[in-house]
A protein has these predicted regions:
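N-terminal subdomain of lithium-sensitive/metallo-dependent phosphomonoesterases centered on the IMPase/IPPase/PAP
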Residues: 1-102, 315-317, 322-326, 330-338
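A generic structural motif
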Residues: 2, 103-105, 197-199
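Short, conserved micro-motifs enriched in small and acidic residues
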Residues: 7, 43-51, 109-112, 232-235, ...
Length: 338
């Protein structure tokens, strides 16, 4: 299948998942959506997740009538892998498709923030695919029940970013143009290190504060020189950068672990490859996405590997933020990735 046709199929599948999840959000009580269904793959699975997973398997089973692929996603068992068509020989698989059917479950199930459907596609490699293999990425907003506009963004490698906005009231779509911030300072802008959950927030906040002080100095009494927005969705964080709302973001939770524990660890809830599978979209928009040491972001396409990442709205600002982040990490005795 030509990549353009595959893109159209993915856009259709995303729309079906989005509409099914929104319908369930309209019909289900908050407490029911937030019921824990299982703990598998790389994260906690809630009742609302099961809705998207059922649609995911159904729709991708239909896609298997046209192409062969390895699907990587939560909800597919402990290894998070299923080959389509069922029983296909690995030698005949064309693509690896990694999906997060609801990125931002916690915010969505309590109707606090939109969630995102994330998909990355790579030509299949028998030895295993990595993030850098992804050549097509799609992200679709799952809106709150009270929200009538929702966005979809996509990118093909070296083809730039494309986006459209859907009006749920009348079904129309309009083209929109993502525009990351071109600011060269973090002063009076949004940006932060992710610290969503109890257990490590003190260290993460200390690194964040140290970095901010390095870049802006001590804030005068009664003033805030920069701001933060802890959006519990990696796709949502990328969206905030893409739309110019945030200037920089980082998720460095794996760096709190000793280096020997940073591979296939299960002791801390971290970002996973399916969470960052659309980073191609950010890079195609000119956003710098990398590791804390400045090297290109990469990870195996699985459901377990912890991922540490930094994203900065433009290269000029990245040249200021990355050295400050590295200095802040060193000050707090946190080792960079190898």
């Amino acid at each position: 299948m030509h990549q353009e046709l595959l893109l159209q199929e993915l856009l259709r599948i995303h729309a079906v998942i989005r509409d099914a999840v929104v319908a369930q959000c309209e019909a289900m009580a908050l407490e029911h959506m937030a019921t824990v269904s299982a703990v598998e793959g790389g994260d906690t699975i809630y009742a609302i997740d099961r809705v998207s997973e059922e649609v995911l398997v159904r729709e991708f089973s239909q896609l298997a009538d046209q192409i062969s692929f390895r699907l990587v996603a939560e909800g597919l068992g402990e290894d998070g892998i299923r080959d389509f068509p069922l029983g296909v020989h690995p030698a005949h698989i064309q693509y690896t498709i990694i999906v997060d059917p609801i990125d931002g479950t916690r915010g969505l199930m309590y109707q606090k923030r939109p969630a995102w459907i994330l998909t990355g596609v790579a030509p299949f490699a028998s030895g295993g695919n990595h993030l850098h293999d992804i050549t097509l990425a799609v992200m679709t907003e799952i809106p709150l029940v009270k929200q009538h506009l929702c966005d979809t963004l996509w990118a093909v490698q070296s083809g730039g970013v494309h986006a459209q906005r859907r009006n749920r009231l009348n079904g129309t779509t309009t083209t929109i143009s993502p525009s990351p911030s071109q600011a060269t300072t973090i002063l009076n802008g949004f940006g932060n290190i992710a610290r969503f959950f109890p257990g490590a927030r003190t260290q993460l906040a200390a690194v964040d504060d140290y970095l901010t002080t390095l870049m802006l100095g001590e804030a005068p009494a009664g003033r805030a020189l920069s701001f933060e927005d802890q959006y519990i969705s990696t796709g949502g964080q990328f969206y905030e950068l893409l739309m110019g709302h945030d200037r920089w973001l980082a998720d460095i939770r794996p760096l709190l672990l000793p280096p020997a524990q940073r591979v296939q660890q299960r002791t801390m809830l971290c970002c996973h490859p399916y969470d960052v599978c659309v980073e191609l979209i950010a890079r195609e928009a000119g956003i710098v996405v990398c590791k804390a040491n400045g090297s290109p972001l990469d990870a195996p396409l699985d459901v377990h590997s912890p991922v540490s990442w930094v994203a900065v709205a433009n290269p000029t600002l990245a040249k200021r933020i990355l050295p400050a982040l590295q200095q802040a990490l060193a000050h707090h005795n946190l080792a960079l990735e190898e």
